[in-house]
Amino acid sequence: MDSRDAPEVPGIRQPANVTTDLKMIICKLLNSPKPAKTFPGSQPVSFQHVDIEEKLLAQDYYVCEKTDGLRALMLIIMNPVTKEQGCFLIDRENNYYLLNGFRFPRLPRANRKELLETLQDGTLVDGELVVQTNPATRLRELRYLMFDCLAINGRALVQSPTSSRLAHLGKEFYKPYYDLRAYYPDRCATFPFKLSMKHMNFSFDLDRVAGSLDKLPHVSDGLIFTAVDTPYTVGGKDSTLLKWKPEQENTVDFKMILEIPVVEDDTLPKKDRNRFYYNFDVKPSFHLYIWQGGPDVNTRLHDFEQPFSKKELEILHRTYKVFAELQISDEQWAKMKALEQPLNGRIVECAKDQETGEWKFLRFRDDKLNGNHVSVVQKVLESISDSVKLEDLEHMIPRIKARWEERKSKKRTHSSISGPMLPPVAETKAPREATQSRYIDDEDWSDEADDDDEDSLKRARIE
């Protein structure tokens, strides 16, 4: 079994009536025609060989590590009645969880006291929850790694390019959060976890990002390529958002159905209902099902403590179909039984053994209600057969950088010929070296010392 279990979503799951109201708030916040029935976050597509030429060489891209955690959006809004700030996490099943203890201020306009007087309202952030090892304390901690922003204080950003959204996320959301922790740590004692921003490097630095994966304080299973100048795709697949994984990390989420051996007790009368019974002492067969769309046979794992009845299997086959068999060793079966948890009908993440073609169990994915859709499975299989190796990407780095410089030069030429005269703008600081196993944390967003502030020369480091 794999030890990379996704963290549980913290907070209090909200009832249907509250969830409906929150969905409507997001609908208005993003200027959507109607509330989304599914998770409003964008979804990446698997990287293929054709994407090198058609995407990485054709337009500017950021690259960052792909965190193996739990994807979640964070919504921060003010309650118009109580005037209190509410913070909610939204998981991939579009469930909403209330988080108590946070306080997110706005960016001060005059002085730092505004950090205690203002509150974010109408902000929607995209990120990943992960359990990681704190480099300083060596303790395991929950952290939210942010990588995009859909709205900031009531202003929708989904039509803005990625570069602009990241700038708003850093300056208008993360910086005041950092400053509050730095200047008023006592006001942050109730925060349920810490927040960080992911490093976004230029695509031609992909080799350095890949080389840093083993140095990160959490598990990372690949790379994410995000186009610099594209808008945010709400609630669907984004063909420009690419996820690359090493061949061994290309996995599929299945619904696992157990076929328990049936034993006949011929000492009992033929009409005795106990004459046939399930033998739970013998290792069962494990069938992997892929989702074809539509509602599941059931929505709660605790309903799957017993084998499916004939009627339940008939209902299941309306939305799922058998795809493969899962090979479970006697040792794995012993570990599964020792969990003393329901197994039948759970979602499991599996990897394909390239030598034998067999599917191997990695971990349970209780954060997912359904397994991967048949279309997703097909894409993953294509990605496996058309596997893009890291060496293939590294070989293209000189061309990627050359194309980047060509586009940069054309923009400069165009602006000098047709653009209006603009005042000089300070050059953007280069991104942090990707070989450093850190995130945009704390000191990256600190202001220069104020002349009239004695303690500003020694601002607290708050890793």
UniProtKB/Swiss-Prot annotation:
One of its GO terms (molecular function) is GTP binding. It is found in: Nucleus. The keyword Nucleus applies. GO terms for cellular component: mRNA capping enzyme complex. The active site is at residue 66. Heterodimer. The mRNA-capping enzyme is composed of two separate chains alpha and beta, respectively a mRNA guanylyltransferase and an mRNA 5'-triphosphate monophosphatase. It catalyses: a 5'-end diphospho-ribonucleoside in mRNA + GTP + H(+) = a 5'-end (5'-triphosphoguanosine)-ribonucleoside in mRNA + diphosphate. SUPFAM superfamilies: DNA ligase/mRNA capping enzyme, catalytic domain (SSF56091), Nucleic acid-binding proteins (SSF50249). Its main location: nucleus. Its EC number is 2.7.7.50. Residues 441-455 have a biased composition (Acidic residues). GO terms for biological process: 7-methylguanosine mRNA capping; positive regulation of transcription by RNA polymerase II; tRNA processing. It is an enzyme of class 2 (transferase). Second step of mRNA capping. Transfer of the GMP moiety of GTP to the 5'-end of RNA via an enzyme-GMP covalent reaction intermediate. Belongs to the eukaryotic GTase family. Keywords: GTP-binding, mRNA capping, mRNA processing, Nucleotide-binding, Nucleotidyltransferase, Nucleus, Transferase. The keyword Transferase applies. This is mRNA-capping enzyme subunit alpha. InterPro entries: mRNA_cap_enzyme_adenylation (IPR001339), mRNA_cap_enzyme_alpha (IPR017075), mRNA_cap_enzyme_C (IPR013846), mRNA_Capping_Enz/RNA_Phosphat (IPR051029), NA-bd_OB-fold (IPR012340). It comes from Eremothecium gossypii (strain ATCC 10895 / CBS 109.51 / FGSC 9923 / NRRL Y-1056).
